[in-house]
């Protein structure tokens, strides 16, 4: 039977408590971020290089629009709550940020409304450079810049990407204490979790995302895939990359992973599990898989593994570490 969040919450709590009591080393060996921060503060404003290579200069922005929920949260963490005038729908749907009721919603993160953005007269817009789901953001660049609005692009997949964006945002707001409390301190806790919990036997793992239209497997380049890899798991898609495009239950049965992790996408978890049952679990051989037979077929919570966890990224690592060690003893 697929395990849920409640079944392992106690184990995670003990692990998190232990991690929070330890002063630790800086996070290392996690790869490079997806864009390079090159920033300089001067009397003429604050200048940095964004995710699409633009040299961006900002001058104490007072009207900021963010087109992703995770970016809105980062801006708020950086001390910019009072200057956030507009955001995307997922910010209020998926996150509890304590935003005022009258904040402007300028479309979804996939389909932002340029007219509504321009009507807010922003001096800075935070956009995503990821073209897989948010190519509409890149398409807004000319319109925004043509209106004299600074359009800054970011790419956040892994923790170090979050840390880079947070550093830029706290440089802009001048709130460097926030960079240390919601960035560096989290980095240190992650480093300790990895150091204390990495598995040496490299158990194999399958990571899946299920949604109303089907099922998609993920490799070690994804947010959760990277965390599993850092904790010592071997993602089966790293050896079978064709499964990224051609999801195959038969290949899963052939490889027989030690762990199967599932992330539900969308607003209906019941529908996600129904989709799993109809498209995966209905195979007669499914129940005989090592992961299923040993209760290592696990549903992961969306708040830690679908949405960017930002200032609680260490909780995502601790959650996985608790799962992996719970099954190992």
Predicted regions and their residues:
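Bacterial Sec-exported substrate-binding components of ABC uptake systems
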Residues: 2-17, 28-73, 176-207, 319-329
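Short helix-initiation/N-cap motifs at beta->coil->alpha
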Residues: 50-51, 104-115, 240-249
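Extracytoplasmic/secreted envelope proteins and their assembly/folding machinery
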Residues: 61-62, 68-73, 114, 118, ...
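A short, structured surface patch at a secondary-structure boundary
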Residues: 66-120, 124-134
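Short secondary-structure boundary segments
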Residues: 88, 129-130, 240, 263-267
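Alpha-helical, coiled-coil/dimerization segments enriched in small aliphatic residues
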Residues: 91-94, 216-245
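Extracytoplasmic ligand-binding site segments that recognize negatively charged/polar headgroups
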Residues: 93, 131-139, 154-168, 202-223
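Structured C-terminal subdomain patch of bacterial secreted/periplasmic proteins
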Residues: 161-174, 180, 262-329
